[in-house]
Amino acid sequence: MFRKIAAAVSAAILSVSLASCSMTEKSVTEVVNNTEVPPKMLFLGDSIAAGYGLEGYTADDNYHCRSYSNILREKYNEELRGKCGHTMVNKAVSGATSSDLIGQIQSGQLDSDLADCDAIVVSIGGNDLLGIMLDLFNSMGISESGSFNKDNFDFFSAASMFLSINSDVDKALDQFELNIKTIAEELDGRTEGTVYIQTLYDPLEYYSKFKRVTDFSDEKIGRLNEIITENSACGYKVIDIAADFEGKAGSLTNIADLDIHPNAKGHEVIAEDVDAAFRATGFTYTTTVYGDRQLSAEGRIVIGGIIAAIAFLAVVGAALLLRKKKDN
């Protein structure tokens, strides 16, 4: 009988060694790492974010111009190399208004990018006022080609136009305030990432000789930026681009050519502002760390059974030896 028990134990030990792969496992630990910049960032909004006017920009390609999103992509690819890597997605659409952005978000086409995004940067609002402002430009004798005949400038027509479009601009701003709240709400329901909304710089400050123009744009664009700032409690952080462009429209935009968009230098300034906002926030990413191989739960059960069997074998063996001595 002792030999049978010993054989059974030996067989059990053999089976454990044959099944050693399932008897052991490596411990797995998820480690949260801190980083100053986002592993994945998404840019939304209008032509400013798209990079309109820069060399390499096309209407269907936001990735081959030196826009602020691409400047940061290059920077973060290097900074996060060998760590978690970096991904930049730019879904900005030139000409988009705040209503257009709402439609884009609600369509669901951004859901997959929003779901795993760490930072979402939005540039929106300029086109909400652009059409109205262009009417004003036309009334001043500024053509679509960018020419401006000062000799034929009609001050009275311009003044009349200011009065007539003022209410239109105010209505557009009222709608923008409703839209910015909707944008924040829609994004909040689709992402765990941090949302940032940029303020809008005032390119019309360039026309400093025409105080009525600069006063009007300062008031209306200033109000738009107040709306952005005052509604940040809806769930986003504000990146104050306007502050760093103030007094520099001539050097940071193409307004001298009747193009309100940032030039290459302007995009570098925006990139610095966005980068500073990211670093003030901070982000995390998770890595998996594997420890030394150890017994799995199944292995502990089996080994426990074998130990019990060996102990039982020892007891039986001792009893048999004792009985044998008594028989002798």
Task: Go through each PLM region and give its residues.
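Structural recognition of the beta-strand scaffold that forms the well-ordered cores
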Residues: 40-45, 49-51, 87-92, 118-123, ...
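C-terminal motif of bacterial Sec signal peptides marking the signal peptidase cleavage site
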Residues: 17-20
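C-terminal membrane-anchoring or membrane-association module
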Residues: 2, 314-328
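Catalytic His-Asp segment of secreted/periplasmic serine-dependent ester chemistry enzymes
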Residues: 200-295, 310
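Serine-esterase "nucleophile elbow" of acetyl-processing enzymes
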Residues: 22-92, 110-112, 140, 263
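Selective detector of the "anchor" transmembrane alpha-helix that sits immediately C-terminal
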Residues: 302-320
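Oxyanion-hole/transition-state-stabilizing segment in secreted/luminal serine hydrolases
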Residues: 100-171, 202
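Active-site segments of SGNH/GDSL-like serine hydrolases
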Residues: 164, 181-218
